[in-house]
Design a protein with these regions (language model features):
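Catalytic cores of nucleic-acid ligases and guanylyltransferases
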Residues: 1-205
Length: 205
């Protein structure tokens, strides 16, 4: 299992051509180790949660190649509206029999934003934008598996984030290596105060 790279909180995001920007989703950070016949989903605390999200088994068919390790966020939606309370209900389940009835009523999505290994090769020492480029080439969108978009413009993503009421925005240096378990200034996050409910499905998809 791999410990995900973390972002430092800041009051204001950095600007400039050295950064890209992504929406910060309020979900469960999850590393996905996928092969054509196997899938392992693990949390920041190295907990195996594969059995809690059987609808994400489709991830095994969502990329070209033999094997891959992804970094992303599991999010629960209720009629297009993200609900962390709904996700917590799924997070707490251990029994597969309890999960099954919720697959139709309370499904989850996995938003992928990084590629850590591919076809047996580690990408930790590969710059972020090269990882993003390879991820885009091999990724196949699935019913419950999506690619998280990123922006070059801080102003544009901040406008969208506030419009749709997202939790925040993450800025990442284009040349950043992937540093498992480390919280560095290469990735920084700015959180917003959220008051109302909001719809995210249309914009992210």
């Amino acid at each position: 299992m791999i410990s995900p790279m973390l972002s430092k909180p800041v009051e204001e995001l950095p600007s400039g051509k050295n950064y890209i920007y992504e929406i910060k989703l309020d979900g469960q950070r999850t590393i996905a180790e996928a092969g054509k016949k196997r899938l392992l989903l693990s949390t920041r605390g190295f907990q195996n949660v594969t059995g809690r999200y059987p609808e994400l088994q489709g991830l095994k068919q969502c990329f070209k190649g033999e094997d891959a390790i992804f970094d992303g966020e599991i999010v629960a939606l209720e009629k297009g509206i993200p609900s962390f309370q709904l996700l917590q209900r799924r997070m707490s389940l251990r029994d597969a029999r309890a999960v099954t009835p919720l697959l139709e009523t309370d499904p989850v999505l996995y938003y992928v934003f990084d590629l850590l290994h591919y076809n047996g090769r580690s990408l930790f020492r590969t710059p972020l934008m090269e990882r993003k480029s390879l991820l885009k080439k091999i990724f196949i969108t699935g019913e419950h598996v999506k690619l998280l978009p990123f922006f070059d413009s801080k102003e544009k993503i901040l406008q969208q984030a506030r419009k749709f009421g997202y939790e925040g925005v993450v800025a990442k240096r284009r040349d950043s290596f992937y540093l498992p378990g480390q919280r560095t200034s290469l990735w920084v996050k700015q959180k917003f105060q959220l008051i109302d409910s909001f719809v995210i499905g249309g914009w992210l998809e």
